[in-house]
């Protein structure tokens, strides 16, 4: 499968030091690649870039890891077979 993991774009992936969500996304990418999947990390705060990457990436699965971007879920849904949204922040 071709999988997109969408990060918040706050810090790089993998992070230099602390970055729990960023490290989790990195770990997911490594494990999924080891299982034979093609994985792309999209890590930008620019929602237009995210929409562009997903629209033209032809992904089977898109996993959004930042609930602040929830308003673009409807834009992403037509461009993948499965759309997953997770929140990792204790608001």
Predicted regions: what they are:
Residues 1-91:
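Catalytic cores of nucleotide-sugar-dependent glycosyltransferases that transfer UDP/GDP/TDP-activated
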């Amino acid at each position: 499968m071709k999988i997109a993991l969408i990060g918040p774009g706050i810090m790089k992936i993998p992070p230099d030091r602390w970055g729990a969500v960023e490290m989790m996304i990195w770990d997911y990418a490594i494990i999924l690649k080891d299982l034979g999947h093609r994985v792309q990390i999209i890590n930008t705060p620019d929602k237009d870039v995210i929409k562009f990457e997903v629209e033209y990436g032809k992904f089977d699965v898109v996993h959004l890891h930042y609930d602040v971007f929830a308003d673009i879920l409807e834009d992403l849904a037509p461009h993948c077979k499965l759309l997953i949204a997770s929140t990792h922040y204790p608001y």
